[in-house]
Amino acid sequence: MPDAPKSNSESLKKLYSDMLLIRRFEERAGQLYGMGLIGGFCHLYIGQEAVVVGLMGAAQEGDQQITAYRDHGHMLAMGIDPKAVMAELTGRSTGLSRGKGGSMHMFSSEKKFYGGHGIVGAQVPLGTGLAFANKYRGNKNVCLTYFGDGAANQGQVYESFNMAELWKLPVIYVIENNQYAMLSLIHI
């Protein structure tokens, strides 16, 4: 986890700095993608920076994160080196997954980041499993499990909610409503 700030003023500056880092990183990634220097897909996190930065500000050492394919911002907020993330995006061997995972499939066991996942909602049961492992091991860690509004209607998401409630698992489900999903209405 990133180092905790010492004062409220310092804390606010750190939050702003982290959000700005994510925004500028994503803007550059978008440029490189447009130039054809990033292969495959590149799902940007622009406009959602405050979600992960705010939650990381409350996270404790050892807490895990798992998310979908908009994962660059999560890694940066966890303190993963931006050069390693960019190296992965551009397919270099110095990337987090040795240049093989690209935008959607990065991973850092050292930072407890268990990846971005390309299948909508697939990370939710995995995050629930990480929470089960925390409970089984008796540690005090939680798993922050992020998903978008489009994944909110997937069956495995509701099954995960049910298991988490039945077993009182240490998981926080974070729905990032970026309004990209075509069939997830927030107004009637």
Please annotate each region the language model reported:
Residues G73, Q179-M182:
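Short gly/pro/ser/thr-enriched loop/turn and capping motifs at secondary-structure boundaries
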Residues W167-V174:
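A glycine-rich helix N-cap at a beta->alpha junction
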Residues M1-K13:
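Charged, compositionally biased N-terminal leader segments and the immediate start
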Residues L20-Y33:
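N-terminal glycine-rich anion-binding loops that anchor highly charged ligand groups
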Residues I186-I188:
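Conserved small/polar residues in nucleotide/adenosyl-binding loops
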Residues G148, I175-E176:
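Active-site flanking residues adjacent to catalytic metal/cofactor-binding acidic residues
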Residues E27, M35-W167:
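Cofactor-binding active-site loop characterized by glycine-rich and histidine/acidic residues
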